[in-house]
Amino acid sequence: MKLTFILPLLALTLVARAEEPKPLRAGIIGLDTSHVLAFTQSLNKGPKNPADADKVAGVKVVAAYPQGSRDIEGSTKRVPEYTEKVKALGVEIADSVEDLVQRVDVIFLESNDGRIHLEQLRPVLAAGKPVFIDKPIAGSLADAIRILDAAKQAKVPLFCSSSLRFGKTTQAVRNGSIGKVKSAETFSPASLEPTHVDLYWYGVHGCESLFTVMGTGCQSVKRGTTTDGKIEVTGQWAGGRTGIFREENGQDRKGYGGKAIGETGEAPVGGYDGYDVLLFEIIKMFRTGVVPVSAEETLELYAFMEAADESKRRGGAEVTLQEVLAKARAEIAARP
């Protein structure tokens, strides 16, 4: 009787163990953004919604390399505080990126300063570790191309995204809730950092929402100013579709949001649903090797924002994405 009872119990135990996800040791590069606290809290203590615990099961942040930006004061001043906070969550501090990659299986490249991403990424790619790069992917379009090309050559899963991409209403439209999108308008904060392309620093959030619902196919960009003095960027997509990003104004465009018009109706887009929605996609990529955002779409998004800067330099003239991409590739050819 005892054996009859024990054998089924043993079988159930073995099945349960087989279904448990493989443990993954995560490492963080750059402790100069609040995102590291949000991600580490969700992975090491549990997501905000306990029902989502299975989406992060088996993944823990075990080590971090603190150095992020070297000269952006708003970033550098955060490092000591955030270092202590992640240590309190059980994270060990590594002496270098090279040291970090030896301790972990997967990487969050979180340095707020996009200019140092390529440098910090190289040891990660050399070690073959899957990596998520927080926005912006780089400080320039040329470096964005270098990063995407290097990951492809190394055959390492890599993607970059704002959490805004995975907001519920934005994803619904992306997945066809209003049919093919004919036009969309999004807004978000767009504070500037002189060392970066204007929209790379913060406007990328609203621009990412725009590309999530519009998809690829943007051909040209014109930059202007709203009636209340804020940034306005209008993109023309193939097939006569139009996408517009505007800087939020704290009034009728407050925070994050927007609207998409499709073949079968319209819907709100661009809302902020927290960091966990992005984190869950990162974990899926770490486990499957399948990226949720293609390199092509990411490159077009950053070309759109670079073209907006070029349009600004030309007094609001129309600038094609093909032009800024060619310029960036020429820069790479001159300085590989």
Where are these regions (language model features)?
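Hydrophobic residues in well-ordered beta-strands that form the structural core
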Residues: D95, I133, L158-C160
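A contiguous active-site-proximal alpha/beta segment in oxidoreductase catalytic domains
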Residues: I137-H196
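Sec-dependent signal peptide recognition
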Residues: M1-P8
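Short helix/strand-capping hinge loops at secondary-structure junctions
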Residues: G128-P130, K135-P136
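Rossmann-like dinucleotide-binding domain that binds NAD(P)(H)
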Residues: E185-R253, E296-A303
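Hydrophobic h-region of N-terminal signal peptides that target proteins for export
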Residues: L9-A18
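N-terminal glycine-/serine-/threonine-rich beta1-alpha1-beta2 phosphate-ribose binding loop
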Residues: L3, E19-A127, K152-Q153, R314, ...
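C-terminal helix-rich "cap/oligomerization" subdomain common to oxidoreductases
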Residues: E20, I107-F108, T288-P336
